[in-house]
Amino acid sequence: MSDRVIIFDTTLRDGEQALAASLTVKEKLQIAQALERLGVDVMEVGFPVSSPGDFQSVQTIARHIKQSRVCALARALPKDIDAAGEALRVAEAFRIHTFISTSSIHVESKLKKSFEDVLEMGVSAIKHARRYTDDVEFSCEDAGRTPIDNLCRMVEAAIKAGARTINIPDTVGYTVPTEFSGIIQTLFNRVPNIDQAIISVHCHDDLGLSVANSIGAVQMGARQIECTINGIGERAGNCSLEEVAMILKTRADLLGVHTNIRHSEIHRTSALVSQLCNMPVQPNKAIVGANAFSHSSGIHQDGVLKAKNTYEIITPESIGLTQNNLNMTSRSGRHVIKHRMESMGYAESSYDLDDLYGKFLTLADKKGQVFDYDLEALAFFSQIHEEPEHFKLEYLGVQSGSSVMATASVKLKVGQEIVSEAATGNGPVDAVYQCINRITGYEISIDKYELKGKGEGKNALGQVDIVAQYKGRKFHGMGLATDIIESSAQALIHVINSIWRADQVAEQMERNVAKTDKINTESV
């Protein structure tokens, strides 16, 4: 038996079914090319018979993808298989994936046929698909709830008909790992021609067990896992590609198998799919969540600084990230504060660690997470505990519409002076940001803009979180208001004030250096 597990990605077929809005052909191609870079062996990219648009997207992807095998789905019907075959003809290498339900509830209630009819339809579909390609995959839909005797008969007949891959789906995410592994083990024990095909699994996450079921199946001999980026898919989603890929890599000592996945492309691919599908990744998502490599506990942070593998079983670099995050919160210890100051180039002799740590705890209790620029200001700018607002929003007005360019008028209090500015922009938020940037004179680029709703009804608030770049450094801002334009402005002003404090620190440091140089010169 091979020690390689084939990764069959179905983000563009099963994953896309979960989206509120369909992806464009261009967006699907972007994702397909990202999957190719990631190293997936097979990508299922659509259901050609379902619509002209799906046919076109499958054909376009098939024409452009060269390294991965392109697959399309078809019911066990000649018209479905013909549509898939025609759409895939232009591919370098392709697969037709045909399926039929095999569980009693599906056969009797959905198909309203006998199992013998279903068996015959499955065999006929495989033979029809082989007119287009030798690479035919057959799925026993709802295999997890199919009587085992019927499942064994179907698998044996499908292999005899010419299917190279037999897929065993837990379509409704019903089974538990021992149960699903037992199904796979039984197939290997009872199907006489099982060695003539690759056994695949396709698990859904309705009970949160899709990844565990897939790994259990591999331990029993399955050599293909069907999965999606970020686990997107019908209902609660599908088996997560990034999770199974990293499990098989990290626990190769136990599982003894490998994949062709380029793990350093995982984070990049996850982010692209999240963006194009408009499906944010939950922060605590394994492998690709924002908190996956973040440490907030002081004990954990201290351990990671001493040896990363104390609390990290995989490295952020292994999935394409540059480093882990030590979130500075009220739970962080002195060791973390000293480490962050050293990483910014400040020797311990240039500040009082005990004094800095006391100020840090006060600020952390007030605002939650503290950033590097906050730490600098705490060390070298005495008024930081008062959170001085050098820039303060006094007035905001916007005019926009579908046929007019957005215009904004903004008044800021800058120190003790009121400064006004007007500007146009690509939408009201951009117009407001143009005004603020003109008033402050800072050349800022926005890396991330995120809007969240807080509360319900007419009293609901819009929270805007942004990450901005200024002179190579990242600054975080947050605004909260009933008007999202105002909350957007407040978020940028939050950033502006942080930048101003950072500049004050830099100027103070320059004065300190100049003063020291003068004293040294006079001493000489």
UniProtKB/Swiss-Prot annotation:
Its main location: cytoplasm. Pathway: Amino-acid biosynthesis; L-leucine biosynthesis; L-leucine from 3-methyl-2-oxobutanoate: step 1/4. It catalyses: 3-methyl-2-oxobutanoate + acetyl-CoA + H2O = (2S)-2-isopropylmalate + CoA + H(+). GO terms for cellular component: cytosol. It is an enzyme of class 2 (transferase). Mn(2+) binds at D14, H202, H204, N238. GO terms for biological process: L-leucine biosynthetic process. Its EC number is 2.3.3.13. It comes from the Bacteria. CDD domains: DRE_TIM_IPMS. The keyword GTP-binding does not apply. Its cofactor is Mn(2+). Pfam families: HCS_D2, HMGL-like, LeuA_dimer. Keywords: Amino-acid biosynthesis, Branched-chain amino acid biosynthesis, Cytoplasm, Leucine biosynthesis, Manganese, Metal-binding, Transferase. It is found in: Cytoplasm. InterPro entries: 2-IPM_HCS-like (IPR050073), 2-isopropylmalate_synth_dimer (IPR013709), AIPM/Hcit_synth_CS (IPR002034), Aldolase_TIM (IPR013785), LeuA/HCS_post-cat (IPR054691), LeuA_allosteric_dom_sf (IPR036230), LeuA_bact_synth (IPR005671), PYR_CT (IPR000891). Residues 392-524 are annotated as: Regulatory domain. Residues 5-267 form the Pyruvate carboxyltransferase domain. GO terms for molecular function: 2-isopropylmalate synthase activity; acetyl-CoA C-acetyltransferase activity; manganese ion binding. Belongs to the alpha-IPM synthase/homocitrate synthase family. LeuA type 1 subfamily. Catalyzes the condensation of the acetyl group of acetyl-CoA with 3-methyl-2-oxobutanoate (2-ketoisovalerate) to form 3-carboxy-3-hydroxy-4-methylpentanoate (2-isopropylmalate). Homodimer. This is 2-isopropylmalate synthase. The gene is leuA.
